Amino acid sequence: GSLKARMCVRGKELLYEYCENYRVPCERIGKIIVATSPRQFETLRDYQRTAKANGAGELSWLSQGDVEKLEPAVFCRAGVLSPSTGIIDSHSFMLSLLGDLEAHNGVISYLTEVSAINTSSGITVRCDGFELAPRVLVNSTGLDAVALSPVTEPEDRGYFAKGHYYVLSGMSPFNRLVYPVAEEGGLGVHVTLDLAHQTRFGPDVVWTDGPDYTFETSNLDRFIDAIRRYYPDLDSTRLHTGYTGIRPKLGPADARTSDFVINGPEQTGVSGYVDLLGIESP
């Protein structure tokens, strides 16, 4: 019943519909979540129960042999299959959204920094050398959302979890997304594929004091160990640095996983003002 769960389920339906209507490339390739030891079986059962309760559909139980037939390169003791999980050409999707916006007389102001939001008398947005007074404002600034919000408490702060991705050169050994059982702070180092079926592994979780996109190659051995738990035949010479991304968190490393926070005018106390906080995943 969390916002993350509800938006994942409904968002998936809307996104597939949008891709079909606007011819945005996507592919339902499915996802397998794997347990590499019997100790993790109950976690997979929990995933099945949670998926059903959230309306995400059935996660099919897979034996070790079932997984070997679907993904010969993957080692596990059991798994669950989400057949409706897919991948999308995110660049084409963003261009399509831009076209939608401009078709409805919307304008994007590129290279314009928002430095402050004031709601003491209406809504005022301070930008580079000028101010705007919108009737409606949605603060969806991701990493800066908590700091920019004029209605959060002084003690509130955002936290930053950096994740690294490594790219696997050559032909992909996988046909689907492959996820290990989740770990603290994230979903674990998993397999992602793009529409060209290039393989990426990631992300890990590195807590930082602020936005820092430096790629730290000192984590390579940890990546290799994590990947080989479910892909034992990994040739580490095929791993190359990819990129980093940062997830905005609402709590520190030792905090329980937090939900998305969407505060509309009723919660913010400001007519026309909406805060989107801790939106760490699209």
Residue ranges and their predicted role:
Residues 1-66, 188-189:
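Dinucleotide-binding Rossmann-like beta1-alpha1 core, especially the glycine-rich loop
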Residues 25-35, 58, 66-99, 103-104, ...:
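Helix-loop-beta segment of a Rossmann-like dinucleotide-binding subdomain
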Residues 28, 63-64, 110-112, 127, ...:
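Short loop/edge segments at beta-strand edges and connector loops
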Residues 80-136:
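Helical element adjacent to the flavin cofactor pocket in flavoenzyme catalytic cores
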Residues 214-282:
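C-terminal catalytic lobe of FAD-dependent flavoproteins
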